[in-house]
């Protein structure tokens, strides 16, 4: 750690000692890539407020860099997985998800998706075991006496560490496939009549056939789809804790769920007291652009610019796709800044410049920006909402199709399919978004909603972490549903009892009526004989 950061860290610690004793120690179980961007924003704010933050990460981590100086502590544990192997494996999974998973039928798509999820969670399971079964590491962390754990729910293990150390924990999450973690671990409510199942690409305004589709999705995810090998994870948790338990039961002990969306993005739905929405917490005002980039932007004149990025995980694409996209971009009057790390397309127009990296937030906040071509990652969408920029979505994998579906439903975006789109499809979508004022009006409405909050998303996220530290948890916000079985939660036992009571009463009345009828019949026969 550099002398500068050492001094900063010591000053923070001293301020903590001389303050009212509100500084705490936070242990973090992160997830890579865009998830880390959100998590890091929260952690940096916690450090600014005087808290001691330690990130537990493996030696194979691709983004959490232990060599960079930072006030955030890194506790790196060894794993048999190498950084290159893990990164290559994850990129192969993504490549198969984008180009290999067939969408021809519902069953084939989600069956292939389940295989990819199992592959991913096999790596997660390995990393969790390497951490938890490292006795030296566990002893060191136990002696550190952390006050709280902040974990990304997408990567299980943070809740297991919290159980081992007997400390409260919070989750950060966008979503899990089929809302598996939210439903089974958090007890979230998703009425299928008006809440679209994630990845169904539906809105909350569903016609009858769409509600049927939504119900089929829900039943499939609830009773058939398994996001990971349940037995493997449940057995591992039971062995480590020394008692029968499940991953979902352990997840259910989370004090708070910090969901990385907000009502500018989400469709209205019920949620629990220990859930808060902190979407866009990483967004901030735009900074000045580098000189060369600013000159290029200014050269666009009244036509303005288009920002194009498919995110940090997709830096390359096929030559055919690149040429098709470049051909479309060459036909618009706007200047285009394209984040691209592949071979220069032959059809690249003079209005388009390629960059290996873009200051995306600063470009989206520039007054000359007219549109944003995006893969639909939550972070990028929130930057577009924050700055009020209409979008053309080219969703690739994970939540991106669903994210773009939300923006389309709110009238702030159009989408094209990377597998089937032509140059004309992209060109028409771009022209519509740029020239039709309704898209700008709709995204500005979302932007105003986003900015009109009683507390900024980042402040709200940090508040709940500090709240849990101050009160040693937030049990008063945890619904009793976590203590009920599936049968009790759905009141099936009560319904069965009431039905049994009704059936008993009907049975008794029927028997009584039959008894009376027989008596009367006997008397009638007796009178006839007499």
Curated annotation (Swiss-Prot):
Parts of the chain that traverse the membrane: 495-515
This enzyme's EC code(s): 2.4.1.17
Keyword flag Transmembrane helix: yes
Keywords assigned: Endoplasmic reticulum, Glycoprotein, Glycosyltransferase, Lipid metabolism, Membrane, Signal, Steroid metabolism, Transferase, Transmembrane, Transmembrane helix
InterPro entries reported in the protein's UniProt record: UDP-glycosyltransferase, UDP_glucos_trans, UDP_glycos_trans_CS
Organism superkingdom: Eukaryota
Name this polypeptide is given: UDP-glucuronosyltransferase 2B15
Organism (species): Homo sapiens
């Amino acid at each position: 750690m550099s002398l500068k950061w050492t001094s900063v860290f010591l000053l923070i610690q001293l301020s903590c000692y001389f303050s009212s004793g509100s500084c705490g120690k936070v242990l973090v179980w992160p997830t890579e890539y865009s998830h880390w961007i959100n998590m890091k924003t929260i952690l940096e704010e916690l450090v600014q407020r005087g808290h001691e933050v330690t990130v537990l990460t493996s030696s194979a981590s691709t983004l959490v860099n232990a060599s960079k100086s930072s006030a955030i502590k890194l506790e790196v544990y060894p794993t048999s997985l190498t950084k290159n192997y893990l990164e290559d494996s994850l990129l192969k999974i993504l490549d198969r998800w984008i180009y290999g998973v067939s969408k021809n039928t519902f069953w084939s798509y989600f069956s292939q998706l389940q295989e990819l999820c199992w592959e991913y969670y096999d790596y997660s399971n390995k990393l969790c075991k390497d951490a938890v079964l490292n006795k030296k590491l566990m002893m060191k962390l136990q002696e550190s006496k952390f006050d709280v754990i902040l974990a990304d729910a997408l990567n299980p293990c943070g809740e297991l560490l919290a159980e081992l150390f007997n400390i409260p924990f919070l989750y950060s999450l966008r979503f899990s496939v089929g809302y598996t973690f939210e439903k089974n671990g958090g007890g979230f409510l998703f009425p299928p009549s008006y809440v679209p199942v994630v990845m169904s690409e539906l809105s909350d305004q569903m016609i009858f056939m769409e509600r049927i589709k939504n119900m089929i999705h829900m039943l499939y995810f609830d009773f058939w789809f398994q996001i990971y090998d349940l037995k493997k994870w449940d057995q591992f948790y039971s062995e480590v804790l020394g008692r029968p338990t499940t991953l979902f039961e352990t997840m259910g002990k989370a004090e708070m769920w910090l969901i990385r969306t907000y009502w500018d993005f989400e469709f209205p739905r019920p949620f629990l007291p220990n859930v808060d929405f902190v979407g866009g917490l990483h967004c901030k005002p735009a900074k000045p652009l580098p000189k060369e980039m600013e000159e290029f932007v200014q050269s666009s004149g009244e036509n303005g610019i288009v920002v194009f990025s498919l995110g940090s995980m997709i830096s390359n694409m096929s030559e055919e796709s690149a040429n098709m996209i470049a051909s479309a971009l060459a036909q618009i009057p706007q200047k285009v800044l394209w984040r691209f790390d592949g071979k220069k397309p032959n059809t690249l127009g003079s209005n388009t410049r390629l960059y290996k990296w873009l200051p995306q937030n600063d470009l989206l906040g520039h007054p000359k920006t007219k549109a944003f071509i995006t893969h639909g990652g939550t972070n990028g969408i929130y930057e577009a909402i924050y700055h009020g920029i209409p979008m053309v979505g080219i969703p690739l994998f994970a939540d991106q199709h669903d994210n773009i579906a939300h923006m389309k439903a709110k009238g702030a975006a159009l989408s094209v399919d990377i597998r089937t789109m032509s140059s004309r499809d992209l060109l028409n979508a771009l022209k519509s978004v740029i020239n039709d004022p309704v898209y700008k009006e709709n995204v500005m409405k979302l932007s105003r909603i986003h900015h009109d909050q009683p507390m900024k998303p980042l402040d709200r996220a940090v508040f709940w972490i500090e709240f849990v530290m101050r009160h040693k948890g937030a049990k008063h916000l945890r619904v009793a549903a976590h203590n009920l079985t599936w049968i009790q939660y759905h009141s099936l036992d009560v319904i069965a009892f009431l039905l049994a009571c009704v059936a008993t009463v009907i049975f008794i009345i029927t028997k009584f009526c039959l008894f009376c009828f027989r008596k009367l019949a006997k008397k009638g026969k007796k009178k006839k004989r007499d």
